[in-house]
């Protein structure tokens, strides 16, 4: 009614893309990012299994949580782009 449907679609499509979303549109760059994050997650898992002092253990856990969150964000961006 009153052409409101079209303006809502235009506003949704006119939102600027974030840097990460732009990188994810390039297929090669997206694969590179995913592989890099996956590699870092595997390395952190290995370091946590080996064990270390409490301070570095806490830092490694924080890093691991951050990279896992980044993996989730990358997955959601992929689903959004499709």
Curated annotation (Swiss-Prot):
InterPro entries membership: DUF5398
Superkingdom to which the source organism belongs: Bacteria
Family stated for the protein in its record: Belongs to the chlamydial CPn_0711/CT_665/TC_0036 family.
Protein name in the entry: Uncharacterized protein CPn_0711/CP_0035/CPj0711/CpB0738
Organism: Chlamydia pneumoniae (Chlamydophila pneumoniae)
